[in-house]
């Protein structure tokens, strides 16, 4: 969706011109992160969202964020984080993307600390870590039981500071309609004001889509029903390549509340929670029996399949 000489290289923005206009659709964690990085590198940012950032799905994330910080003296490393991630993805993940993510993760956690995220700490200045699925060592940084909310609060404040200096322009309560195409080049997008129903055309050098999950595709979801997937559908209709649909995540542990599923955080199993089913009148701890090495902390796809069985 790039119509200019803008790219991301080695985790940093590289822009030929510092006057590029970047349109970002979505104002959750991904959208706000992109807005911050673009603004800090001299770009003009137009941030579009149908809801305020305070209602983004990212606010609901509870468990934590993974990074091989090795504050528990377990000889953890980004390389081991990479190996665990590729294994959990059954070899399907793009190794270049996974390598970049795992190498950057420790630096990104420290960046979030500088933004003001109040991660739990062990000792004076070490980030506390907990267990999560698919990993043999503790590498999940967390902020009490509302990690997503804490990160989003810090991100929202940081973006508002950019707004105050005119570096970011917000278009809250605006929905994405379609891209503006100049031949086969993306040169902006069309949005609609949800209050006035007025259509607005936004010209830009690049469009970043960060609209979250496609919860409207599924009968049962723990995600917000406002994340319908309609933006992804419109891009697909326009011929934008859609990849990695098989990576849509199925969270194994939920509670049914009326017509909605509420998530039980993986942190519950990371802190010792055990999964069982009744068999012959007794509690059968099936994950521990079938997967003795990691037990209840097997990757989510495996755990979800075992529960379904």
PLM ranges: what are they?
Residues 21-47:
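N-terminal Rossmann-like FAD-binding beta1-loop-alpha1 element of flavoenzymes
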């Amino acid at each position: 969706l790039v119509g200019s000489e803008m790219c991301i290289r080695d985790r940093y923005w590289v822009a030929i011109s510092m006057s590029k206009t970047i349109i970002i659709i979505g104002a959750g964690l991904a959208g706000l992160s992109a807005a911050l990085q673009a603004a800090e590198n001299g770009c003009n940012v137009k941030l579009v969202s149908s809801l305020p950032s305070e209602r983004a799905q990212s606010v609901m994330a509870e468990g934590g964020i993974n990074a091989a910080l090795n504050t528990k003296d377990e000889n953890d490393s980004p390389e081991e984080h990479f190996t665990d991630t590729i294994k959990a993805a059954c070899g399907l993940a793009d190794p270049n993307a996974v390598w970049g993510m795992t190498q950057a993760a420790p630096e990104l956690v420290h960046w979030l600390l500088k933004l003001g995220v109040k991660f739990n700490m062990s000792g004076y200045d070490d980030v506390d870590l907990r267990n999560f699925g698919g990993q043999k060592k503790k590498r999940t940084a967390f902020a009490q039981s509302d990690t997503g909310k804490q990160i989003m609060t810090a991100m929202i404040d940081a973006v508002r500071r950019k707004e105050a200096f005119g570096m970011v322009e917000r278009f809250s309560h605006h929905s994405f309609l379609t891209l503006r195409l100049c031949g086969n080049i993306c040169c902006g997008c069309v949005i609609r004001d949800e209050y006035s129903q007025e259509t607005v055309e936004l010209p830009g050098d690049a469009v970043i889509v960060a609209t979250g999950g496609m919860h409207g595709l599924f009968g049962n979801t723990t995600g917000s029903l406002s994340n319908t997937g309609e933006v992804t559908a419109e891009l697909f209709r326009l011929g934008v390549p859609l990849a990695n649909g098989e990576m849509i995540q199925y969270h194994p542990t939920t509670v049914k509340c009326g017509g909605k599923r509420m998530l039980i955080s993986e942190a519950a199993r990371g802190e010792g929670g055990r999964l069982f089913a009744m068999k012959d009148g007794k509690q059968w701890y099936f994950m521990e029996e079938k997967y003795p090495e990691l037990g209840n902390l097997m990757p989510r796809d495996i755990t979800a399949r075992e529960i379904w069985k």
